[in-house]
C-alpha cells in the first residue's frame, strides 16, 4: 500500500478483518495461504510483500524507488528489499501469533520472548547500515526503505520498538513523516 502511494499509482484497497481467511468470503480462492497482503494486477496475483515492491518498481517505477542493475548499490538494494520479510518480519509473525492471534490457552510466552530477542538481534544490521545515513542504500529513498521501514513499523504495533537503537528510531520517525506513508496509513485505517 505504501509503495503504491509513493509511486502515485491508482489502486483499489479492500480492508478486511484480520486474519482475512476467516472473515472475507472468497479470499482463500484468491490467496490459498490466507495471508496479507494480496496484490493483483490483471491476472497476476502476488502475496509476498518484498516481491510486490520489486514488481511495482520494475513495472511502474522507472527506477524512481529502485536502483538500476548497473548501479554499484544494486545488490545491496535487493539484499535489503528481501531481508525485510525473510529476516525482520518473520520473527515478528511469531510474536504476533503468540500474543494476539492464538487463544489464551495456546499462547506461549517463551516463543514470544525468544523471537523478540531474535528480531532485535537482526536489527543490528539495520542500525549499523544507517550510521550517518538517511536511507539504507544508494543515497536515496527506495523500495528497500519501504520494506524495512514497514518491518520496523510492525515492531511498533507489537511493542518491540522500546528496544530500538537511535538510528532505527530516527530512520523510522523520518519514514513515518513521508506523505506516502501517511496516506497509506490513513487509507488502511478507513
Features from the language model and the residues they span:
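Active-site-flanking alpha-helical
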Residues: 57, 151-152, 185
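GST-like domain detector, emphasizing the conserved glutathione-binding G-site
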Residues: 1-110
Amino acid at each position: 500500500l505504501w509503495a503504491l502511494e509513493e509511486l502515485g499509482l491508482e489502486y483499489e484497497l479492500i480492508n478486511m478483518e484480520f486474519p482475512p481467511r476467516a472473515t472475507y468470503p472468497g479470499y482463500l480462492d484468491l490467496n490459498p495461504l490466507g495471508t496479507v497482503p494480496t496484490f493483483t494486477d490483471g491476472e497476476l496475483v502476488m502475496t509476498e510483500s518484498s516481491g510486490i515492491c520489486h514488481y511495482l518498481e520494475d513495472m511502474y517505477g522507472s527506477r524512481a524507488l529502485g536502483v538500476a542493475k548497473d548501479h554499484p548499490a544494486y545488490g545491496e538494494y535487493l539484499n535489503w528489499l528481501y531481508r525485510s520479510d525473510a529476516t525482520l518480519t518473520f520473527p515478528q509473525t511469531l510474536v504476533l501469533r503468540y500474543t494476539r492471534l492464538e487463544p489464551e490457552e495456546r499462547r506461549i510466552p517463551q516463543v514470544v520472548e525468544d523471537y523478540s530477542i531474535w528480531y532485535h538481534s537482526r536489527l543490528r544490521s539495520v542500525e549499523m547500515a544507517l550510521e550517518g545515513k538517511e536511507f539504507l542504500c544508494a543515497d536515496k529513498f527506495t523500495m528497500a526503505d519501504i520494506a524495512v521501514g514497514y518491518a520496523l513499523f510492525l515492531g511498533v504495533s507489537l511493542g518491540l520498538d522500546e528496544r530500538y537503537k537511535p538510528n532505527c528510531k530516527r530512520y523510522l520517525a523520518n519514514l513515518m513523516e513521508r506523505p506516502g506513508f501517511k496516506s497509506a496509513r490513513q487509507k488502511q485505517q478507513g
